[in-house]
Amino acid sequence: MQDDLKNAPIGFFDSGLGGLSVLRKALEMMPNENYIYYGDSKHAPYGEKTPQEIRSLSFNAIEFLIKKGAKAIVIACNTATSAAAHDLREYYKDIPIIGIEPALKPAIKLHETGSVIVMATKATLNQEKFKNLMDKYGEHREVIPLPCPGLVEFIEAGDLEGEDVKNFLREKLNPYMDREISSIVLGCTHYPFVKDVIQDIVGEKVDIIDGSSGTVRELKRRLEENNMESESKKKGNLDIFNSLEDKKILELSKKLIEIK
């Protein structure tokens, strides 16, 4: 039974395609594990929904992954983590559930001076969880919350470097370019897919950080703690599902995760 558990897949869930940026890091750091990814593109973006709606959709997604035999769950969505992680952990006590939050701590530690911009959805920035982070790390440094409604939709449509998304990001970031910005935190798992465009706008001196590595390290720790890590020496399997039953979205998912 324990061997079956070790070989069971790890479930990843996001409001759409964004969580693939976290899954990509997991495939790099733990290639021998099996994975299931569920993207809820039918209901994306979550950032404009109420906390109650986000919780309901998150429970549906977790149920899907558990029915597929997931041994652990990664909520690869900042918005869903903020709104639903606590309730999900209370309900599913027997399964490790790992969330993701804006990587504000490492961003602050990287530099002694300069402001930090946190790009995220409105829902993430409005949640108590983010306000607590602001209270903790924003005491001695300027932290600028930057809601980006509309950016997720570009990425869900596969527009990662077109003129429209470039103009959108310029409009968002240009007002801050006369300040000393040390770091930008990507507080939504969709945003790493446009990291290069953001870097071009802000310049190479600004560090751009996301929470993927920290989340995968925590996943690894929890699996080891529960004796659930795969002992296979082979590369694991990956199955991708999406609530939007559209061939194009699955093709885009594979492209984003660089599956040949």
From Swiss-Prot:
Query: What protein am I looking at?
Result: Glutamate racemase
Q: Please verify whether the record's keywords include Transmembrane.
A: no
What job does this protein perform? Answer: Provides the (R)-glutamate required for cell wall biosynthesis.
Identify the gene encoding this protein.
murI
Keywords, in A-Z order:
Cell shape, Cell wall biogenesis/degradation, Isomerase, Peptidoglycan synthesis
Recorded hits in SUPFAM superfamilies, A to Z, give: Aspartate/glutamate racemase (SSF53681)
Provide the species name. Answer: Clostridium perfringens (strain ATCC 13124 / DSM 756 / JCM 1290 / NCIMB 6125 / NCTC 8237 / Type A)
Give yes or no: UniProt keyword Cell wall biogenesis/degradation. Answer: yes
- What positions does the entry give for substrate binding? 14-15, 46-47, 78-79, 189-190
Question: Which family would the database say this protein is a member of?
Answer: Belongs to the aspartate/glutamate racemases family.
Catalyses: L-glutamate = D-glutamate
Q: Quick one: which pathway? A: Cell wall biogenesis; peptidoglycan biosynthesis
Record-listed E.C. numbers:
5.1.1.3
Kindly report, in one word, the top-level EC class recorded for this enzyme.
isomerase
Q: Where is the active site?
A: 77, 188
The terms under GO molecular function for this entry are: glutamate racemase activity
Query: Which residue stretches, if any, does this entry annotate as coiled coil?
Result: none
Q: Which InterPro entries match?
A: Asp/Glu/hydantoin_racemase, Asp/Glu_race, Asp/Glu_racemase_AS_1, Asp/Glu_racemase_AS_2, Glu_race
From its record, what is one biological process in GO terms? Answer: cell wall organization
